[in-house]
């Protein structure tokens, strides 16, 4: 069960992330650079190529992975999320940006528990500023901002999401608050005999 302090800090980070990256000007920004090739001109996204071909074609949906023309970029999960976006919003960039903002906000919310887990901070009342500061730094770092702005950055956003979830999945005790315990006394106890 999450402690109230953990919930509050997570809410702060989620709100900050949504406020920073969810502004209308960012959500309605155009598709840029590689976004056009990955989304607008990708036959896997538009449905011109059958969806089961996502396992055979490169990220751009143009070449067989085994062909010499392919650059061997293979991101089927990302392509499937673009296809879902296309089914809901067509080529309107708003939906693609909104998904990236949601993914980034989820990642920001996962940073505080990841920091606590990484450093073994299990007491919910100690060091609350460090996980929040780490999450805000994560939210504002230019590498992550670029990944949110450009639709092709979804690959990085999904990678971060699955990494953070995987890390937390392997560190479950750090997510549960527990009472601070004292280490056992290493000195031998006196023998009553």
Where are these regions (language model features)?
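Polytopic membrane enzymes that build or remodel cell-surface glycoconjugates and lipids
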Residues: 1-193
